[in-house]
Amino acid sequence: MGNLLKVLTCTDLEQGPNFFLDFENAQPTESEKEIYNQVNVVLKDAEGILEDLQSYRGAGHEIREAIQHPADEKLQEKAWGAVVPLVGKLKKFYEFSQRLEAALRGLLGALTSTPYSPTQHLEREQALAKQFAEILHFTLRFDELKMTNPAIQNDFSYYRRTLSRMRINNVPAEGENEVNNELANRMSLFYAEATPMLKTLSDATTKFVSENKNLPIENTTDCLSTMASVCRVMLETPEYRSRFTNEETVSFCLRVMVGVIILYDHVHPVGAFAKTSKIDMKGCIKVLKDQPPNSVEGLLNALRYTTKHLNDETTSKQIKSMLQ
């Protein structure tokens, strides 16, 4: 994702160390390898998940035909036959979210451990920092695609309604083994979210903090705010931005920046928008607004609708108006 990138990180928004964070070529050191390899097994499937989601067309036509002609058995069978394999895909996406959650928790454990500061972790463990960024990048790409595809929830709702009717009528349901009732309930909650992958990561980060009570919460929140600063500085500094060899690096940095802001806002007691926040929210929003509008609308919506503290009374009117 670009060549060697020099970034300025400020753990406490004062002068911080300069170091290179290589989003493209970072290789794991011996101490990183165990976690890196575990996370890599998950990440290598990420692109295929996105391709499947991008090509997801839904069974809207077949479902409409079946609903309009309830007595026509052939149309009912055709709709069911179209929906079952699609639900198999939706199940695969959901199961991948669970794997991604486990990968994130492994990375958080490595990047927040004592005795190093978040800045030292990101500098020393660049391969893990890169994987953390890749998880966030995937998450926002997934959610952008999901938000613009209403067929997903329509297909799954039809599947559940039809399955329920078949049970009442004691009709054997081919494909029922694909998704049992408990799994279907969890999938329904997942797909009901506007940004389901981001919600999964937010919940995982909150759970990580609550389960690691011996670890200061600042270790986690400072890791997130430092990563946000890294991305913002790379994007707003022409000298750094000119080093990008690929325009895709810009969208990579934007998605990672937004992802860590949302995670920070869910984990930090007062959130990302408070005056005491270690994230320069005005600077981050300005960077987003400086991009072509159609390329960042999904990211701005993620900040508007999936953060926790944006609408708090303590959030400045200026920040609220910037996101209107």
Swiss-Prot record:
This is CYFIP-related Rac1 interactor B. A lipid is attached at G2 (N-myristoyl glycine). InterPro entries: CYRI, CYRIA/CYRIB_Rac1-bd. Ubiquitinated at Lys-74 upon Salmonella bacterial infection. The keyword Transmembrane does not apply. The lineage of its organism: Eukaryota, Metazoa, Chordata, Craniata, Vertebrata. It is found in: Membrane; Mitochondrion. It comes from the Eukaryota. PANTHER family: GH09096P. Keywords: Isopeptide bond, Lipoprotein, Membrane, Mitochondrion, Myristate, Ubl conjugation. One of its GO terms (molecular function) is MHC class Ib protein binding, via antigen binding groove. Its main location: membrane. GO terms for cellular component: cilium; extracellular exosome; extracellular region; membrane; mitochondrion; platelet alpha granule lumen. Induction: Protein levels are negatively regulated by Salmonella. It is a lipid-anchor. There is a cross-link at K74 (Glycyl lysine isopeptide (Lys-Gly) (interchain with G-Cter in ubiquitin)).
